[in-house]
Amino acid sequence: GENMLDKYFNYRQHKTDFKTEVIAGVSTFLTMAYILFLNPVILADGGFDFGGVFTATACATALACFICAFYAKTWPVGLAPGMGINAFIAYGVCLGMEYTPAEALGAVLVAGVVFLIISLTPIRAWLINSIPKSLKLGIGAGIGMFLAIIGFEIMGLTADNPVTLVQLGDLSNPLLLLGAGAFVSMIVMEKKGIKGNIIIGILVFSAIAWLTGVGKFNGVVSPPPPMTYLFEFDLGAALSASMVTVVFTLFFIDFFDTAGTLTSVANVAGKIGKDGKIQDIDKAMLSDSVSTVAGAMMGTSTVSYTHLRAHETRGNLVCRLLREKK
């Protein structure tokens, strides 16, 4: 019961309790839930099967949160397929370099294994401590800009131009107006501290799109699609010389995005010791790398940490259970 959880998670030591953990878990789920919809949409543009990625995303996120909850239990973070690195896989690897989804998943798997090996060696600490904090944070900012450009193009705010490369889209496009409305509403809700602002914005404006005929309504409940790419990764192609750059890029983004997120969380959560070292970072890095390997086997892109607010402690287990129910 509650006493057993208290004993395992050391609620008193971390100045929290069961009620706080449940609230944190629900808040975490609401913050992360949009990934369940967005990850399949992005990867589908690169040739992945939408339904297969949807199920793989749910299962990989559930497993990753479980691993973090029971192994890296002192970290107030959740894990899910990373937004940004999935766009690189879809638009850079699959569309740009013309690799198949199976080959891309193989590259994700190899990058995850490299991450896992480094996480088990002293190289991990050397890499984290040798990279300037500005670069760690800059990687996240760069990924955010990359995502913004993709989002603007999908919603129609920008369009291709053979001369200037990018031009302003059709401002009378209903899809653009709905997208802009959703974006502004999410920002307003974020400023007001409303939990789940992203998923609320997605659901509300999706409903508006369905009612106005801009979007197609496909129902509310259905059996979960099969995991199309379960153990369907192409390891041979991923180990070829032509994929070295892809594997390195995937590893680089995942490793330093994780390092930046954990450094930021550690600063707020008081997990940096007097010697400047981050407490239990080895467990956090191992959880991330193992989750990435498992996610690639299930058929989704690189799994990474989601940055949560400092007062949200270890709601990972509740997050996992809610994700399973969904």
Specify the residue positions occupied by each region the protein language model found.
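Membrane-embedded helical hairpins/re-entrant loop segments and their flanking transmembrane helices
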Residues: 14, 43-59, 249-305
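N-terminal membrane topogenic signal
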Residues: 14-26
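Flexible hinge motifs at transmembrane-helix junctions and intramembrane kinks/re-entrant loops
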Residues: 184-225, 251-255
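Re-entrant/interfacial helical elements at transmembrane boundaries that shape
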Residues: 37-41, 80-91, 260-269, 302-309
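Short, Lys/Arg-rich, polar N-terminal cytosolic tail immediately upstream
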Residues: 2-15
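Conserved small/polar residues in nucleotide/adenosyl-binding loops
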Residues: 306-315, 325-326
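Early transmembrane hairpin of solute transport permeases
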Residues: 23-172
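Helix-loop-helix junctions that connect adjacent transmembrane segments
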Residues: 160-176, 211-252
